[in-house]
Protein backbone atom coordinates (compact mmCIF):
# COMPACT_ATOMS: atom_id res chain seq x y z
CA UNK A 1 0.00 0.00 0.00
CA UNK A 2 2.84 2.34 0.89
CA UNK A 3 4.46 1.56 -2.46
CA UNK A 4 1.24 2.47 -4.31
CA UNK A 5 1.04 5.72 -2.38
CA UNK A 6 4.64 6.55 -3.21
CA UNK A 7 4.02 5.86 -6.92
CA UNK A 8 0.91 8.06 -6.90
CA UNK A 9 2.80 10.87 -5.20
CA UNK A 10 5.62 10.58 -7.73
CA UNK A 11 3.11 10.76 -10.61
CA UNK A 12 1.44 13.83 -9.14
CA UNK A 13 4.78 15.53 -8.63
CA UNK A 14 5.76 14.69 -12.21
CA UNK A 15 2.47 16.09 -13.55
CA UNK A 16 2.97 19.24 -11.49
CA UNK A 17 6.48 19.70 -12.85
CA UNK A 18 5.19 19.18 -16.41
CA UNK A 19 2.51 21.83 -15.95
CA UNK A 20 4.99 24.26 -14.38
CA UNK A 21 7.37 23.68 -17.27
CA UNK A 22 4.63 24.49 -19.79
CA UNK A 23 3.72 27.68 -17.98
CA UNK A 24 7.35 28.76 -17.79
CA UNK A 25 7.94 28.06 -21.47
CA UNK A 26 4.81 29.99 -22.40
CA UNK A 27 6.27 33.12 -20.79
CA UNK A 28 8.17 33.88 -23.99
CA UNK A 29 5.05 33.34 -26.13
CA UNK A 30 2.99 35.70 -23.96
CA UNK A 31 4.83 38.74 -25.31
CA UNK A 32 2.87 38.36 -28.56
CA UNK A 33 0.00 35.97 -27.82
CA UNK A 34 -1.03 37.52 -24.50
CA UNK A 35 -0.76 36.45 -20.87
CA UNK A 36 -3.76 34.12 -21.22
CA UNK A 37 -3.09 33.22 -24.87
CA UNK A 38 -5.97 35.48 -25.88
CA UNK A 39 -4.08 36.68 -28.94
CA UNK A 40 -3.14 40.14 -30.19
CA UNK A 41 -4.42 41.02 -33.69
CA UNK A 42 -2.27 44.16 -33.70
CA UNK A 43 0.82 41.96 -33.64
CA UNK A 44 -0.62 39.36 -35.99
CA UNK A 45 -0.68 36.86 -33.11
CA UNK A 46 -3.75 34.58 -33.00
CA UNK A 47 -5.57 33.41 -29.88
CA UNK A 48 -4.28 30.01 -28.78
CA UNK A 49 -6.21 29.38 -25.56
CA UNK A 50 -8.35 26.25 -25.65
CA UNK A 51 -6.95 25.03 -28.96
CA UNK A 52 -6.52 21.25 -29.30
CA UNK A 53 -3.24 19.95 -27.87
CA UNK A 54 -2.43 17.77 -30.88
CA UNK A 55 -2.93 20.67 -33.30
CA UNK A 56 -0.73 22.99 -31.26
CA UNK A 57 1.98 20.35 -31.08
CA UNK A 58 1.84 19.66 -34.81
CA UNK A 59 2.11 23.33 -35.75
CA UNK A 60 5.03 23.93 -33.39
CA UNK A 61 6.80 20.90 -34.83
CA UNK A 62 6.06 22.19 -38.34
CA UNK A 63 7.55 25.56 -37.48
CA UNK A 64 10.65 23.94 -36.02
CA UNK A 65 11.16 21.66 -39.02
CA UNK A 66 10.41 24.32 -41.63
CA UNK A 67 7.21 22.75 -42.94
CA UNK A 68 5.60 26.01 -41.91
CA UNK A 69 7.13 29.48 -41.87
CA UNK A 70 9.91 28.84 -44.38
CA UNK A 71 8.39 30.63 -47.40
CA UNK A 72 10.10 33.98 -48.03
CA UNK A 73 6.75 35.82 -48.12
CA UNK A 74 5.42 34.37 -44.86
CA UNK A 75 6.66 37.09 -42.50
CA UNK A 76 4.65 36.06 -39.45
CA UNK A 77 5.42 32.41 -40.05
CA UNK A 78 9.13 33.18 -40.16
CA UNK A 79 8.85 34.91 -36.78
CA UNK A 80 7.16 31.85 -35.31
CA UNK A 81 9.70 29.53 -36.84
CA UNK A 82 12.60 31.46 -35.32
CA UNK A 83 10.84 31.74 -31.96
CA UNK A 84 9.99 28.05 -31.70
CA UNK A 85 13.52 27.03 -32.64
CA UNK A 86 15.00 29.37 -30.05
CA UNK A 87 12.72 28.57 -27.10
CA UNK A 88 11.46 24.99 -27.56
CA UNK A 89 14.47 22.65 -27.60
CA UNK A 90 12.67 19.33 -27.99
CA UNK A 91 9.33 17.51 -28.29
CA UNK A 92 8.95 17.33 -24.51
CA UNK A 93 9.06 21.12 -24.29
CA UNK A 94 6.56 21.40 -27.15
CA UNK A 95 4.20 18.95 -25.43
CA UNK A 96 4.44 20.87 -22.15
CA UNK A 97 3.67 24.29 -23.60
CA UNK A 98 0.90 22.93 -25.85
CA UNK A 99 -0.76 21.21 -22.88
CA UNK A 100 -0.58 24.41 -20.84
CA UNK A 101 -2.08 26.54 -23.63
CA UNK A 102 -4.89 24.07 -24.35
CA UNK A 103 -6.00 24.20 -20.71
CA UNK A 104 -6.42 28.00 -20.69
CA UNK A 105 -9.98 29.44 -20.92
CA UNK A 106 -11.11 29.84 -24.52
CA UNK A 107 -11.35 33.21 -26.18
CA UNK A 108 -14.47 34.10 -28.16
CA UNK A 109 -14.72 36.77 -30.84
CA UNK A 110 -17.98 38.53 -31.64
CA UNK A 111 -18.80 39.21 -35.31
CA UNK A 112 -17.42 42.57 -36.41
CA UNK A 113 -19.60 44.48 -38.85
CA UNK A 114 -22.37 43.23 -41.09
CA UNK A 115 -22.31 39.90 -42.85
CA UNK A 116 -24.77 37.67 -44.67
CA UNK A 117 -25.57 35.10 -41.98
CA UNK A 118 -27.41 32.77 -44.34
CA UNK A 119 -24.64 32.77 -46.93
CA UNK A 120 -21.99 32.38 -44.24
CA UNK A 121 -23.79 29.42 -42.68
CA UNK A 122 -24.39 27.71 -46.01
CA UNK A 123 -20.80 28.13 -47.15
CA UNK A 124 -19.33 27.13 -43.80
CA UNK A 125 -21.46 24.02 -43.40
CA UNK A 126 -20.89 23.02 -47.02
CA UNK A 127 -17.13 23.54 -47.13
CA UNK A 128 -15.76 23.68 -43.57
CA UNK A 129 -18.16 22.16 -41.04
CA UNK A 130 -17.55 18.51 -41.89
CA UNK A 131 -14.01 18.79 -40.53
CA UNK A 132 -14.01 21.85 -38.27
CA UNK A 133 -17.34 21.10 -36.58
CA UNK A 134 -20.81 22.61 -36.86
CA UNK A 135 -19.90 25.44 -34.47
CA UNK A 136 -16.25 25.79 -35.50
CA UNK A 137 -15.20 23.89 -32.40
CA UNK A 138 -12.74 21.74 -34.32
CA UNK A 139 -12.43 17.96 -34.45
CA UNK A 140 -9.43 16.29 -32.88
CA UNK A 141 -10.21 12.96 -34.57
CA UNK A 142 -9.81 14.67 -37.97
CA UNK A 143 -6.89 16.84 -36.82
CA UNK A 144 -9.01 19.91 -37.63
CA UNK A 145 -8.34 22.90 -35.34
CA UNK A 146 -10.85 25.02 -33.51
CA UNK A 147 -11.63 28.14 -35.56
CA UNK A 148 -13.95 29.92 -33.13
CA UNK A 149 -11.89 32.50 -31.27
CA UNK A 150 -9.48 33.24 -34.11
CA UNK A 151 -9.60 36.88 -35.23
CA UNK A 152 -10.72 37.77 -38.75
CA UNK A 153 -7.33 39.08 -39.89
CA UNK A 154 -5.59 35.84 -38.91
CA UNK A 155 -8.18 33.66 -40.66
CA UNK A 156 -7.91 35.78 -43.81
CA UNK A 157 -4.13 35.65 -43.74
CA UNK A 158 -4.04 31.87 -43.39
CA UNK A 159 -6.65 31.47 -46.15
CA UNK A 160 -4.43 33.59 -48.40
CA UNK A 161 -1.30 31.68 -47.35
CA UNK A 162 -2.90 28.35 -48.20
CA UNK A 163 -4.20 29.69 -51.50
CA UNK A 164 -0.87 31.18 -52.59
CA UNK A 165 1.33 28.28 -51.54
CA UNK A 166 2.90 29.97 -48.52
CA UNK A 167 1.47 27.22 -46.34
CA UNK A 168 0.53 23.63 -47.11
CA UNK A 169 2.68 23.34 -50.23
CA UNK A 170 5.18 20.78 -48.96
CA UNK A 171 4.45 17.07 -49.56
CA UNK A 172 5.13 16.15 -45.93
CA UNK A 173 2.50 18.60 -44.66
CA UNK A 174 -0.47 16.27 -45.11
CA UNK A 175 -3.10 18.37 -43.34
CA UNK A 176 -1.75 21.61 -44.76
CA UNK A 177 -2.10 20.24 -48.28
CA UNK A 178 -5.74 19.38 -47.59
CA UNK A 179 -6.38 22.98 -46.54
CA UNK A 180 -4.50 24.35 -49.54
CA UNK A 181 -6.96 22.50 -51.77
CA UNK A 182 -9.97 23.69 -49.78
CA UNK A 183 -8.82 27.32 -49.85
CA UNK A 184 -9.36 27.42 -53.60
CA UNK A 185 -13.07 26.68 -53.15
CA UNK A 186 -13.68 29.99 -51.35
CA UNK A 187 -12.41 32.62 -53.75
CA UNK A 188 -14.67 35.62 -53.09
CA UNK A 189 -13.68 38.16 -50.41
CA UNK A 190 -17.35 38.69 -49.61
CA UNK A 191 -17.92 34.96 -49.14
CA UNK A 192 -14.86 34.75 -46.89
CA UNK A 193 -16.18 37.63 -44.77
CA UNK A 194 -19.54 35.88 -44.46
CA UNK A 195 -17.88 32.61 -43.41
CA UNK A 196 -15.77 34.41 -40.80
CA UNK A 197 -18.86 36.18 -39.49
CA UNK A 198 -20.58 32.82 -39.16
CA UNK A 199 -17.57 31.31 -37.36
CA UNK A 200 -17.56 34.11 -34.81
CA UNK A 201 -21.34 33.99 -34.33
CA UNK A 202 -21.29 30.22 -33.89
CA UNK A 203 -18.42 30.41 -31.40
CA UNK A 204 -20.15 33.11 -29.35
CA UNK A 205 -23.35 31.03 -29.23
CA UNK A 206 -21.66 27.99 -27.64
Segments (PLM) and residue ranges:
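Sequence/structural segment immediately N-terminal to covalent heme-attachment motifs in c-type
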Residues: 18-38, 112-137
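A charged, solvent-exposed segment within the mature domains of Sec-exported extracytoplasmic proteins
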Residues: 119-169, 181
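Disulfide-stabilized extracellular ectodomain repeats and their linkers
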Residues: 26-29, 45, 53, 77, ...
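The feature marks the first
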Residues: 22, 27-65
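An amphipathic alpha-helix signature
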Residues: 53, 57-65, 94-98, 102, ...
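Axial heme c-ligation environment in periplasmic c-type cytochrome domains
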Residues: 40-47, 64-94, 110-115, 140-146, ...
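Bacterial N-terminal signal peptides
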Residues: 5-16
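Intrinsic disorder/low-complexity detector
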Residues: 98-122, 206
Amino acid sequence: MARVGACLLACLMSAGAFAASGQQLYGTCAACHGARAEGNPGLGAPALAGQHVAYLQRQLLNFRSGLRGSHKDDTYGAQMRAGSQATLPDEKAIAAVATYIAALPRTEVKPAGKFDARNGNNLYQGKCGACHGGQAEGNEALSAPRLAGLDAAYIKRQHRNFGKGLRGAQPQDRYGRQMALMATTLASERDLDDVIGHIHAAGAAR
